[in-house]
Amino acid sequence: MNYTLETADRALGAFPALLGAAFAHDSLFAAHMWVLFFTLVVSTLLLLRRVSFLPPVAGPPCRRTEYFDEVVKYGVMATVFWGVVGFLVGVVVALQLAFPDLNIAPYFNFGRMRPLHTSAVIFAFGGNALIATSFYVVQRTCRARLFGGNLGWFVFWGYNLFIIMAATGYLLGITQGREYAEPEWYVDLWLTIVWVAYLATFLGTILTRKEPHISVANWFYLSFIVTIAMLHIVNNLAVPVSFLGVKSYSAFSGVQAALTQWWYGHNAVGFFLTAGFLGMMYYFIPKQVNRPVYSYRLSIIHFWALIFMYIWAGPHHLHYTALPDWAQTLGMVFSIMLWMPSWGGMINGLMTLSGAWDKIRTDPIVRMMVMAVAFYGMATFEGPMMSIKAVNSLSHYTDWTIGHVHSGALGWNGMITFGAIYYLTPKLWGRDRLYSLQLVNWHFWLATLGIVVYAAVMWVAGIQQALMWREYDSQGFLVYSFAESVAALFPYYVMRALGGLMFLSGALIMAYNVTMTILGHQREEGASKGAAPSLQPAE
């Protein structure tokens, strides 16, 4: 591969970015176009180092039957990088809440850093993990090379360009004000193009498969890709004020805008953070423990029940609002129904270890994956419980919800991703094993303790917060002002930052471990604690 076409594409793309910066109708659009221009110029210069202008050397025809793993390698590295960045920004945001003087206006205040954190963790860390693992899994389970040639490269680089544009936009103050859908219209259009290419690559690989059976992991990955495309397009329907400006107006307003937003927001959780990562679970846990999926029939029931029910659950985010009561109740009912298929999937994941339970003790990667499934079960019980109106009246708008989200995002999505990265890295780079399994063990305990501290503190803080808000005296006046309720949360916010710092420390250990594995180093280690002793001849 001589990278000539890829280099030309980036060089040509820099030209319209330069024109956009020159003729922009507002300073924010001009600044964003300069960011795009310099990003494309730097990537062009980096690729120029690998371009070969020599004619191809005659030789035997190149075989294109091997798996296309180079893009998966880059996906793994991007996942690790964005994970560390996202967790670091999360710790900064947590400290800003505890110590407001750390807010640096205008670019690094809480209002701009918070969406940077959520997008970095969900879309940069989680999205790159999903793209990398889906490209790896679909090739192995279909026994076919990734479809589309260099289309896989376009998906990877195009998606990461979206991440850069979205992140810099947040710091500049460019936002639609829609949670998890903050990027403005032109960034949304770019993501749509990339996502269609992603769908074509993944679906094309399935259609050209040499394996007659389609793995259940691919069903979950495909549902995530298709549904996210639908959600993204509908929720981001907007009319730009100018094609050379950042501002746009949504196609929806009022309660319709709220319902569309949380139809998107909840199903981003349901399909981006659940269905896609279940694809990981159904492939990597059986591979790591060397056992088949416990019940393939249960996995199919899990899939179709999840697909049918999740899409209806969004209105539970809008209890006690202007949304019609029947819609709120509908969202609550489907949320409660979701508990059954979710726990069916959890049981299926855990029972896959049947006959290999000892690996929880001896293999820290398996331990990490099992902990992920346990957090999946906990989060999918807590979510339906919080959707019940009586419970929601206490939990809504409080830090309890923040604790719930992080127990799922860090415990489920984070842990299963870490396990997948530890599985993939030695295989992709042809190493015998990871640099250090003891470091994996350290990562596991730091991450687990960090999540437990974070979630438990937020549960307590949220309940205290809610009870202070609804405390009335005998005359019907509020006992506590809002400022008093905020001041009471200070020790909890410090503890939350500590939990986040522990989780970040684990991610830094992972980054070091993965880097050393890629470089080909191996740390000399004795048997890990808890490992079964080797058999000795009878005396």
UniProtKB/Swiss-Prot annotation:
Q: Please tell me one Gene Ontology term that the record gives under cellular component.
A: plasma membrane
The UniProt annotation places Cu cation binding at H266, H316, H317
Q: Name one GO molecular function term.
A: metal ion binding
Record's cofactor remark: Binds 1 copper ion per subunit, denoted as copper B. Binds 2 heme b groups per subunit, denoted as high- and low-spin.
Q: Which CDD domains would you find in this protein's record?
A: cbb3_Oxidase_I
Top-level taxonomic group: Bacteria
Ordered alphabetically, the record's keywords are: Cell membrane, Copper, Electron transport, Heme, Iron, Membrane, Metal-binding, Respiratory chain, Translocase, Transmembrane, Transmembrane helix, Transport
What membrane topology does the UniProt entry give?
A: Multi-pass membrane protein
- Please state what the protein is called: Cytochrome c oxidase subunit 1 homolog
What's the gene?
A: fixN
